[in-house]
């Protein structure tokens, strides 16, 4: 009916789980789709609860997919002179943004390993995460443990940096990861955020302060 009324229409619909399958009648809601998709096991601790994203990441991803579908539909309509219907689902969107994790699991059988420390990601090398300081928090991304150990003057961390187990030894690697986080936290806790970030920056460590919304709004960036 719509294309009869407007033969140039580009129509996009968004569902929860697609238009087929046993999940079809289920409510399509961000938290529920996060939980269904496996994403909630990508962070947190081994003995802790699954960890959903606090922002509506599934809704956001699906809205971007819908926007891209509209743009692709306009191109197809203009080239072929036909109306276009595109279908987007919340589930497809959250699977797309997990493509790295899911394909790794499917090709190797391995999953992200949550540990005793609250990892920011179950897939990343330590000390990928957030740590407390005397006056706030510091986030550390992919970085050299040896460089961090030198800046923090930590012999414990320097020793851990040279004793990383073989990647194929999951049990030993997990034990090593669990050992790294508390040592980094112990070294950072008595230090101030600003000067520590500056020192880590100078050593090539990817890091930054963890800010509140008020901090963000006041920042000159």
Model segments located where?
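A structured beta-alpha segment of the ubiquitous adenosine-cofactor-binding alpha/beta core
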Residues: 1-4, 189
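Active-site-adjacent "lid/gating" segments in soluble enzymes
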Residues: 3-143, 150
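Active-site-adjacent capping/gating segments
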Residues: 117, 124, 215-221
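Proline-centered helix-kink/hinge sites
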Residues: 7, 206-209
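Short secondary-structure transition/capping segments
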Residues: 24-25, 170-172, 219-221
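Acidic-histidine catalytic/liganding microenvironments
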Residues: 6, 154, 219
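Short, solvent-exposed turn/loop segments enriched in Gly/Ser/Thr/Pro and often Arg
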Residues: 15-18, 213-219
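Aromatic-enriched alpha-helical interface/lid elements that frame and gate functional surfaces
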Residues: 122, 126-207, 214
């Amino acid at each position: 009916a719509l294309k009869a009324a407007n033969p140039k229409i580009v129509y996009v619909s968004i569902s929860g789980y697609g238009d087929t399958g046993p999940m079809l009648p289920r409510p399509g809601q961000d938290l529920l789709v996060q939980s269904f998709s496996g994403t909630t096991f990508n962070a947190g601790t081994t003995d802790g609860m699954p960890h959903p994203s606090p922002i509506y990441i599934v809704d956001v991803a699906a809205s971007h997919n819908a926007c891209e579908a509209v743009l692709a539909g306009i191109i197809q309509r203009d080239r072929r002179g036909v109306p276009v219907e595109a279908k987007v689902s919340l589930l497809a969107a959250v699977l797309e943004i997990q493509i790295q994790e899911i394909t790794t699991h499917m090709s190797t059988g391995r999953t992200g390993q949550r540990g005793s420390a609250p990892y920011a990601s179950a897939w990343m090398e330590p000390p990928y995460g957030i740590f407390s300081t005397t006056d706030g928090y510091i986030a550390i991304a992919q970085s050299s443990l040896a460089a961090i150990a030198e800046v923090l003057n930590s012999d414990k961390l320097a020793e851990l940096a040279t004793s990383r187990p073989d990647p194929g030894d999951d049990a030993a690697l997990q034990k090593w990861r669990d050992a790294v986080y508390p040592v980094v936290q112990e070294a950072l806790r008595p230090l101030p955020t600003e000067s520590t970030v500056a020192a880590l920056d100078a050593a090539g460590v990817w890091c930054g302060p963890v800010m509140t919304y008020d901090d963000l709004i006041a920042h000159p960036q």
